[in-house]
Amino acid sequence: PPTRVVATWREVAAAAGERRCVVKSAGGPGRGVSIVVGTAEELRVERGLDPPFLVQDYVVAGEVDHKLYLVGDQVRGLLKPSPLAVGHTTEGAPFTPAPELVDLARQVRARLDLDFLGVDVLVSESGPVVVDVNDFPGYRGMPDVPELVADHLLARAAA
């Protein structure tokens, strides 16, 4: 979705306007990240997040985040409860991503030219939407990723 980076909370409210937006601190590893949702009117009062801020149009989707983890061209999936529904959690369940999600994740990888990344996707009524990309994510909850990483690095070293 359209995303803006702003430096002050006043700019957060201006960027949101009448739209519902998701606001979070830019950067960092994602642990303990606070997310606030609202319109400019609802975002008048500063919420204690650290600047700079990401202001992202709200995507109407279910209460599940589709986390896609890539090691080279290999894509693994983890379903996690949305932090908007339950707050931050490390719990999730591995799943086999649909071909359209695999293709989307690979497109992001190709565009960024990264070997290791995480792509957070929400599935809305109009289709999947990338809401976050992490270079070298934690891969927590993905049982075969250590072997995938080792195999990928060995193959790259041998090339």
Regions found by a protein language model. Name each.
Residues 1-34:
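A conserved helix-loop-beta module that forms one wall/lid of the active-site cleft
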Residues 110, 114, 123-159:
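C-terminal active-site "lid" helix and adjoining low-complexity regulatory extension at the edge
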Residues 6-10, 59-61, 115:
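Short beta->alpha connector loops
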Residues 119-121:
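Hydrophobic residue at the +6 position relative to the catalytic HRD Asp in the kinase catalytic loop
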Residues 17-18, 27-112:
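Phosphate-binding site of ATP-dependent enzymes
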Residues 21, 54, 76-77, 117, ...:
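Protein kinase-like catalytic core scaffold
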